[in-house]
Amino acid sequence: MTAITITDAAHDYLADLLSKQNTPGIGIRVFITQPGTQYAETCIAYCKPGEEKPEDTALGLKSFTAYIDSFSEAFLDDAVVDYATDRMGGQLTIKAPNAKVPMVNADSPINERINYYLQTEINPGLASHGGQVSLIDVVEDGIAVLQFGGGCQGCGQADVTLKEGIERTLLERIPELKGVRDVTDHTQKENAYY
């Protein structure tokens, strides 16, 4: 069973849109493109009868059916579709707090686990300085090769951040990881935080 919420206001707005399509049985399909990545986007599309996929979860609502993409469903946990009126008419919003969160566990490949901790624990802190760090590769000796960007590229504190923050966090979370290495060109200082 899906944990997505479609508010009454959103339901009524969508029902009105669907009624204008002149297609009996038309519903909506909710899905996420590139789920579990920083590029994830939550989408709602019209879904004519027969366009739904057999593996979709059908969510029967008062006036129409919402089909939830099976691959996206776990990422739509706690999602809320709402409609708010304003002076310009109104706006449909989709808040899906788990859309960009990778689904990993102890058996996931090491690169997926590293990316998970970079996205959920490390990059949110670096974002306050306008920076981020990305995984480039995991080399054979168990070293994660990382690259800084934004305000972290060229920052005078990058070495401290790498060793005291990033490496310490990753080594605590991923026991088989042996260390991290920075391949950033820190001579580029235009956007550096420090």
Swiss-Prot record:
Highest taxon of source: Bacteria
Gene3D superfamilies: Fe-S cluster assembly (FSCA), HesB-like domain
SUPFAM superfamilies given in the database record: Fe-S cluster assembly (FSCA) domain-like, HesB-like domain
Keyword Metal-binding: yes
The name this protein goes by in its record: Fe/S biogenesis protein NfuA
GO MF entry, a single one: iron ion binding
Entry cofactors: [4Fe-4S] cluster
Note accompanying the cofactor annotation: Binds 1 [4Fe-4S] cluster per subunit. The cluster is presumably bound at the interface of two monomers.
Keywords: 4Fe-4S, Iron, Iron-sulfur, Metal-binding
Residues the record lists as binding [4Fe-4S] cluster: C152, C155
Keyword Metal-binding tagged: yes
InterPro entries: Fe/S_biogenesis_protein_NfuA, FeS_biogenesis, FSCA_dom_sf, HesB-like_dom_sf, NIF_FeS_clus_asmbl_NifU_C
Endpoints of the signal sequence: none
Subunit structure and binding partners: Homodimer.
Pfam families named in the record: Fe-S_biosyn, NifU
Protein task: Involved in iron-sulfur cluster biogenesis. Binds a 4Fe-4S cluster, can transfer this cluster to apoproteins, and thereby intervenes in the maturation of Fe/S proteins. Could also act as a scaffold/chaperone for damaged Fe/S proteins.
Gene that produces this protein: nfuA
Organism for this UniProt entry: Pseudomonas fluorescens (strain Pf0-1)
Single biological process term from Gene Ontology: iron-sulfur cluster assembly
UniProt similarity note: Belongs to the NfuA family.
